[in-house]
Amino acid sequence: MERSKQSHDNQADSRPTTNESSLNGHFDGLVKKTPGMWDVKGRGTAGESSSHTGSSVVENWKHERTRSIEDNEMSLPSLAAAYTTIIRGLGKDPQRQGLLKTPWRAATAMQFFTKGYQEKIIDVLNDAILDEDHDEMVIVKDIDMFSMCEHHLVPIFGRVHIGYLPNKRVLGLSKLARIVEIYSRRLQVQERLTKQIAVAITEALQPAGVGVVIEATHMCMVMRG
């Protein structure tokens, strides 16, 4: 089975450590914060002053559009109808006993697989950012990650490892896993997922540095050979 290793992160096994040797070299250069900007793997920078960037991002998070329960209920029939069309397109009878409820099951499952669109980062981080005079690297490893490839609509799964160097502020360890879950439970590519996790942590904490590593299996590669 092929595994792709890239710089990303997700939901954790709650094994924090401050021992940098356990991930020796993996975080170096992935995301390094400089005054007023963030830089992810050298692919572009963004930001103004640190304080302005942080506050503006939080405001954007507050007004982020999410998919509501009502949206799910309204879209479920059309989503189920689309699965019915797929079944017919595969040459199968959607009225056959084994397939009769499949469109609704599949539609409900897809809404669950993409439930990250229903959640806001600001709700996760609310009251979870703590003032703490701690300057050693915080590492959370083996966060379980489940996502959907946006190219083929098949699963991506693996583990995320996150490390950051605090700058007078820390985040509750369980919230790192929640950040991973929110961004992974969407239609994704691994590169974007990695960046979104790293940027969320960077903008929330303004740390001295952030590193995100994702080890993932892409079923679009494994199943197709």
From Swiss-Prot:
Listed Polar residues bias regions: 13-24, 47-58
Entries under InterPro entries matching the protein: GTP-CH-I_C/QueF, GTP-CH-I_N, GTP_CycHdrlase_I, GTP_CycHdrlase_I_CS, GTP_CycHdrlase_I_dom
Ion transport recorded as keyword: no
Metal-binding recorded as keyword: yes
Composition skew (Basic and acidic residues), residue ranges: 1-12
Enzyme class: hydrolase
Catalytic activity: GTP + H2O = 7,8-dihydroneopterin 3'-triphosphate + formate + H(+)
Subunit structure: Toroid-shaped homodecamer, composed of two pentamers of five dimers.
NCBIfam families: folE, PRK09347.1-2, PRK09347.1-3
Record-given protein name: GTP cyclohydrolase 1
Lineage, top ranks: Eukaryota, Metazoa, Chordata, Craniata, Vertebrata
